[in-house]
Amino acid sequence: MPNPFSRTPQSPSQASRKPSVVELLSSPPPLPSPDHDDVHSFSLSRHTSMSSVATGATGDRSRGSVSAGTTSGGVDWSDIKLSELTEPQKLISINSGYTVQEAFKTLVTHNLTSVPVSLSKTDSSDLENCLSFDYSDLNTYLLLLFGRARLDALSVDEINVEGSMSKLEYAQQMVNKAKHGGEVPVDFILRLHPKNPFIKFPEQETLYPAMEALGNGVHRVAITKDSSPHAPITGILSQRRLIKYMWENARRFPSLDFLINSTIQDLNIGSSNPLTIHGDQPLIDALQKMFTERVSSLAVIDRSRCLMGNISIVDVKHVSSSKNQDLLFKSVLNFISYNLSQKGIEAGQDQYPIFHVSNQSSLGRVIAKLVATQSHRLWVVESRQVKHHASSSGGFGSISGTRSGSISGASSAGPVEAALSPQSSSNNSAAAAAAAAASNPSTGSGSVSGSVSGTNSASGTGAGDSGLPGKLIGVVTLTDILGLFAESKYGKKIDPGLARRQRRRSSTSTRSSIDTTQGEIFRKSYTKQEGVFGKE
């Protein structure tokens, strides 16, 4: 008797099968149909969500190579003009006459992570020479107010001072003014906290030079109208926008197929030594570490090095007012709980961020998660197939080897991993629950740490049934992926850490040039303030 539940391949139910979540997160979005606008009309909205990954994906989205039709009609991504990626209508800018508070409000109002700052004190559109303000500047400002950053560790020599007052005296005056609630010009903090030079490319330049710059660790580049010295800026291209563009257009670029289907271990990208903070440490320690190391994110781990969460430089916006000031001196886990609850209130639903992958995750899966979560990095944890006794270096593969050699020998068909299985969802829920426990006023950070450690030890594994993502063994960033794309094109060695080292060298050279015998600048303790921007 035939099985009543079996279906032939021609069965309508079988033919109309919707793709699984794993398939949606592992394959690039389909190309637009001929009935729609051409392939140049992809949206580059900053408000990416999971729905944007799934839009239009009701057809068969199985893994494998790009179809023959797409390959024959494909284009070389390095030939794309930068004008295709610019959004002049979205270019928001401010001038150096803005206060730090006004600059911060601009970021929040327009949902930006960075904004160009004209050197003019009145004309925000004059961007011939400009700096940029982002949340790392806000973090520096906050740490100065709380005595966790010293002026002799910053670029005081870059400050513009009128009159006979020394630059250090002027800087001290500005900090004291801010401590008493006074407004400080944004130009002051920008010059104290210099970044990499603003690299500019004309609209008619091809994508490769920008890919190379962003793959070397530059976070964003400016797009100008033409190549003339005084050409106006028409747009800003960030790492996050570029990776979204490459993902949405991946089916146009058959040369990416091999990379997208390979695992991150086979491609040998990322770092096996990510910067971390323990969940029971004070939040202000995490902010200070990001300032010192010139990074924008830290992995939050427990004392067994199991991943518990993530803290980003953007999170500093939640502690800029006096009503949340106490969070600075509570545990990082406590802050994560607060942050998730606030996002849940704003979005109207629970928030369980997907911030980790394994070394067996395909690059396509990693990129899809980065785009869906609008993240700059994902933490790499031990694969569930790896025993607890496996070493961290073994768990992450031969990451210190030569990338180009790994690419040539990698398998062309990476596995489809079920990282969003029900077990994975419970992992994120458990991590959020651990953070929620930290927010209980009756529970100290030490108790939280003990509770989390107990959860881990009960299972006997770092990534098995503990309810946590697993033991941290690495990190993969937008810089790593964009550098991989650039390197795979011409074989030219790309250094993902170049820009970061330049930022740190700039800071170190400034410190060594300042006379540090002038004594301590800030008080050791700071008992009461009005917050960075008052009681908002």
From Swiss-Prot:
PROSITE patterns: CBS (PS51371). Residues 1-72, 439-466, 496-536 are annotated as: Disordered. Residues 192-255, 267-327 form the CBS domain. Keywords: CBS domain, Cytoplasm, Nucleus, Repeat. GO terms for cellular component: cytoplasm; nucleus. Residues 439-460 have a biased composition (Low complexity). GO terms for biological process: cellular response to glucose starvation; regulation of mitotic metaphase/anaphase transition. It is found in: Cytoplasm; Nucleus. Transmembrane segments: none annotated. GO terms for molecular function: protein serine/threonine phosphatase inhibitor activity. Residues 1-17, 42-55 have a biased composition (Polar residues). SUPFAM superfamilies: CBS-domain pair. Involved in DNA replication and cell separation. Belongs to the SDS23 family. This is Protein SDS23. It comes from Meyerozyma guilliermondii (strain ATCC 6260 / CBS 566 / DSM 6381 / JCM 1539 / NBRC 10279 / NRRL Y-324) (Yeast).
